[in-house]
């Protein structure tokens, strides 16, 4: 859910004050400090990432909620990664086998994206209630029949580490681009939907 789409002027204006993002990294060029809340003006992930599915998901959610409800997102993402990157116990081994660009990207998260997500989610719980977990990942795991179990492990670890219950905090997993839209990884949707 890192966001590859180019951020256009229309994406940076009219963001509702009730839609917030917690900075996952320090971003001096945007005046953002890791662990602090800001109005959710893109980029929501790191200093130079693009538009993410969370951008308009959050905006739409805020529009449909009562005026006294805020929506906050904590977005820790690495575009092009496999779900194994978020397996806290095995991520070091996984990172060691990855290309340099990925190794450099995860440095922004202290070389452990899961740990950073957990750290920020604990901080977010001080300001509100976690109501759901969004996942948009799968292209790099295309064809991996074990993907649902790997995602389940990450989800269950988050629930455990944050003292959450699955009945209260659903996991919402998005599909990848469909075949009729020239999605090269469209076959993964069958696995995502299991």
Model-identified regions with their sequence ranges:
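Cell-envelope and extracellular/periplasmic
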Residues: 1-194
């Amino acid at each position: 859910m890192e966001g590859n789409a180019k951020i256009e002027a229309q994406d940076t204006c009219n963001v509702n004050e009730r839609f917030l993002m917690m900075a996952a990294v320090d971003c001096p060029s945007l005046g953002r400090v890791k662990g602090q809340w800001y109005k959710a003006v893109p980029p929501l992930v790191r200093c130079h990432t693009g538009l993410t599915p969370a951008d308009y998901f959050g905006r739409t959610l805020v529009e449909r909620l009562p005026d006294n409800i805020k929506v906050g997102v904590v977005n820790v993402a690495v575009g092009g990664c496999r779900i194994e990157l978020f397996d806290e116990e095995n991520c070091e081994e996984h990172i060691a086998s990855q290309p340099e660009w990925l190794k450099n990207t995860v440095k922004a998260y202290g070389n452990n994206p899961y740990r950073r997500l957990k750290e920020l989610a604990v901080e977010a719980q001080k300001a509100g209630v976690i109501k759901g977990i969004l996942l948009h990942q799968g292209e790099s795991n295309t064809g991996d029949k074990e993907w649902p179990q790997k995602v389940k492990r990450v989800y269950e670890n988050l629930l455990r580490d944050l003292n959450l219950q699955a009945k209260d905090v659903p996991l919402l997993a998005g599909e990848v681009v469909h075949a009729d839209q020239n999605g090269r990884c469209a076959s993964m949707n069958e696995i995502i939907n299991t």
